[in-house]
Amino acid sequence: MDPSEYRTIYTVEDRHWWYAGMRRITLALLDETYRGRANLEILDAGSGTGAAMGYLARFGRVTGIDLSPLALGFCRERALTRLGQASVTALPFAAASFDLVTSFDVLYHRAVGDYRDALREFRRVLRPGGRLLLRLPAYDRLRGRHDAVIHTGRRFTTGELESSLRETGYRIERLTYANTLLFPLALAKRLAEPLLPATGSHQSDVAPNPEWLDKVLTAVLGAEARRLRQHDLPFGLTVVALARK
């Protein structure tokens, strides 16, 4: 990821519609799964600037790792302390250390290499019956300028992720798309990008928005979150998987 992107994410992450919406979707799935439990040992693998570690703490004690010292610095600015610098393909933890491993928009990164190595590492550090919650960008045809900034190596379909999870020994509990209602707008934007002039070196989709826009789009994803408690969605901008060791 371009270094400047970490600062941008840290600045907008708590209120930007995409992050706020993904937070609602994540919490809906975990609330439905754990129903009030607050004693889990949790690893956030690829913690970025740390916002997810904050909201995961309602379920237990959260440890975060990231390969980027810059990202970990932003985590410390959030007063997070259970942190380590490590790759998702070589976790510095003993086997069976965690009840839940989360990894949000990490395994798509070209620096990861073979993402299945990370899936094996996640499984190794999970306790028997422990769960993995993954979130990844969907569909290679949705690649755009944003992907160049964040160093996307690949995007996923549910079918591809299902095959990889089964291959690495997981039992799949949920596998769905998310960010479905906004899919047509995103697809139109991606198709139009080659026709539009570049506006500078920074082409990320992550940027401050008007407050009203963040509120409206967060509400849209909040509606999806309620639906996802019990039902899968057939397409979307994001792939979400909940799998068990």
Segments and roles (model prediction):
Residues 1-94, 100-104, 119, 236-239:
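Conserved N-terminal segment of class I S-adenosyl-L-methionine
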Residues 51, 174-214, 218, 234-238:
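Conserved catalytic loop of SAM-dependent methyltransferase domains
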Residues 105-109:
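Short catalytic micro-motifs in class I SAM-dependent methyltransferases
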Residues 111-115, 144:
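Short N-terminal helix/helix-N-cap motif within the alpha/beta-hydrolase-1
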Residues 116-131:
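A short glycine-rich, Lys/Arg-flanked "PGG" loop and its adjoining helix->strand segment in the class I
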Residues 132-154, 160-163:
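Short, glycine-/aromatic-enriched active-site segment of Class I SAM-dependent methyltransferases
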Residues 162-178:
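A SAM-dependent methyltransferase catalytic signature shared across enzymes that methylate proteins
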Residues 221-245:
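C-terminal lobe and adjacent flexible extensions of AdoMet/dcAdoMet transferase-like proteins
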